[in-house]
Amino acid sequence: MKRIAVLTSGGDAPGMNAAIRAVVRQAISEGMEVFGIYDGYAGMVAGEIHPLDAASVGDIISRGGTFLHSARYPEFAQLEGQLKGIEQLKKHGIEGVVVIGGDGSYHGAMRLTEHGFPAIGLPGTIDNDIVGTDFTIGFDTAVTTAMDAIDKIRDTSSSHRRTFVIEVMGRNAGDIALWAGIATGADEIIIPEAGFKMEDIVASIKAGYECGKKHNIIVLAEGVMSAAEFGQKLKEAGDTSDLRVTELGHIQRGGSPTARDRVLASRMGAHAVKLLKEGIGGVAVGIRNEKMVENPILGTAEEGALFSLTAEGKIVVNNPHKADIELSSLNKSLS
């Protein structure tokens, strides 16, 4: 394989630029030509395919977002869209593609492979909801950003003796809420994978204040409900505390990636190129126990929930390849 391309698709994630950089420089070191596909699958169909060299990716490892830009393009799920994209790949002599994104992006990569263009998926999403990898590119940065914001909110929460409901991103996965909640010592962590009773949370808040507690921090995953709705239900259940709600929003998707995300993205990008050089496609790169691994894309993109709650109130990890997490210290809302 002499000529490959790289694209980013779906929601952006810190570390995508580091992955692109690794793909380009590893490919050059292997004697391959590299092209960048701008604006994801939409750009592929439109022919926004341009050559990249080592200088093209200079000084981008520390930048958030993706310099190739990204876009959601549901039309690529249809055969007509796929054939238009493939026509452009053939026009530019592309023989393989590295796709950086989430589960939707992976489906596109699988379609390319089925049409004879080996594609490798790299898990680029802050949600950490891709099966077959302990961590996704961008997750560590998003958790760190959420942690920093929650720490700041804790200061004002304590000053005014308030209860704060803080909504974090994650789509249908509770990973960001879980990790950021543990890291900040949240009083309650509410995630889609675990049930909760509003009256229990109200009782916990009340008991805390009666014992002299100055404030309460509730970290809420967006996949459960909005912070505004949760706050309203909390009041309806009898909460009488001075309540405020905050949605951290897209700040979690931006910013300079952490060292862990930069290294993870660099390792994954380089590994993807090595796979393409061997003619391998239809797989997603992951990390398990700090080692690079490959998994079939289709199964990776279509697995179900990562966590579930047992009848005894314990969280179990459905995906055996997710990183082990110490769950015993979580609050009563998870038990």
UniProtKB/Swiss-Prot annotation:
Gene3D superfamilies per the UniProt record, alphabetical: 3.40.50.450, Phosphofructokinase domain (3.40.50.460)
Question: Where, in this chain's numbering, is ADP bound?
Answer: R21, A22, V23, V24, R25, R154, G185, A186, D187, K213, K214, H215
The record's keywords, sorted A to Z, are: Allosteric enzyme, ATP-binding, Cytoplasm, Glycolysis, Kinase, Magnesium, Metal-binding, Nucleotide-binding, Transferase
GO annotation (BP), single: fructose 6-phosphate metabolic process
Listed name of the protein: ATP-dependent 6-phosphofructokinase
Q: Which domain of life is it from?
A: Bacteria
A Pfam family reported for this protein in Swiss-Prot or TrEMBL: PFK
Q: Which InterPro entries does this UniProt record tie to the protein?
A: ATP_PFK, ATP_PFK_prok-type, PFKA_ATP_prok, Phosphofructokinase_CS, Phosphofructokinase_dom, PKF_sf
Identify the species of origin.
Answer: Streptococcus pneumoniae serotype 4 (strain ATCC BAA-334 / TIGR4)
User: What does UniProt list as catalytic?
Assistant: D127 (proton acceptor)
- Keyword Magnesium assigned: yes
Family that this chain belongs to: Belongs to the phosphofructokinase type A (PFKA) family. ATP-dependent PFK group I subfamily. Prokaryotic clade 'B1' sub-subfamily.
Q: Where in the cell is it found?
A: Cytoplasm
Recount the known activity regulation. Answer: Allosterically activated by ADP and other diphosphonucleosides, and allosterically inhibited by phosphoenolpyruvate.
Q: Name one GO molecular function term.
A: identical protein binding
Q: In which pathway does it act?
A: Carbohydrate degradation; glycolysis; D-glyceraldehyde 3-phosphate and glycerone phosphate from D-glucose: step 3/4
Instruction: Give the UniProt entry's GO cellular component terms.
Output: 6-phosphofructokinase complex
Q: Which residues are involved in binding Mg(2+)?
A: D103
Q: What is its main location?
A: cytoplasm
Q: Which reaction does it catalyse?
A: beta-D-fructose 6-phosphate + ATP = beta-D-fructose 1,6-bisphosphate + ADP + H(+)
Quaternary state and partners of this protein?
A: Homotetramer.
